[in-house]
Amino acid sequence: LDLRYALTSQLTLDVTTNTDFAQVEVDEQQVNLDRFSLFYPEKRPFFLENAGLFTLGTPGEVDLFFSRRIGIGPSGEVVPIAGGARLSGKLGGWNVGLLEMQTRTGATAVPANNFAVARVLRELPNRSRFGAIFVNREGTGELSAGGDHNRTFGADGRWGLGRYGALEGYLAKTS
């Protein structure tokens, strides 16, 4: 069940429950011969819409939030998504994005998780901007160990210099 509600002309709330991504095309099979995880592109419509809002710095340069982790266990098994919500748009001159998703314990012993992302971004004159992001994953339910969480805090900015130049940077901390 999916619901979309326009709170204002520039702010939208999307809610999903008992999410089924069966209509999404299957990923190409890849063989991994090193210790680094394979990164598949996101194909689920709920996560693709307004995805650029949840990036820090230049898109593709650094990915503090990778939505493909939602609904997939550590060994690649499917973890059912109980539901979630996304608030995105403009609010008082700020671009805002809030995403909240909850998974359930599946057929395997993967604990349920709560995923949350909050992003604010302010566009300024002369191609300048600044913003902040918070990403959280918290293990929930009886299978979750105490202290089972990952948190990331980040800030980014871009300052237009003259007609063609720009200075861009970002800072992030994880725990």
Outline where the language-model segments fall.
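Residues that cap or anchor secondary-structure elements
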Residues: 21-89, 95-100
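Residue-level signature of outer-membrane beta-barrel architecture
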Residues: 5, 89-91, 121-124, 159-161
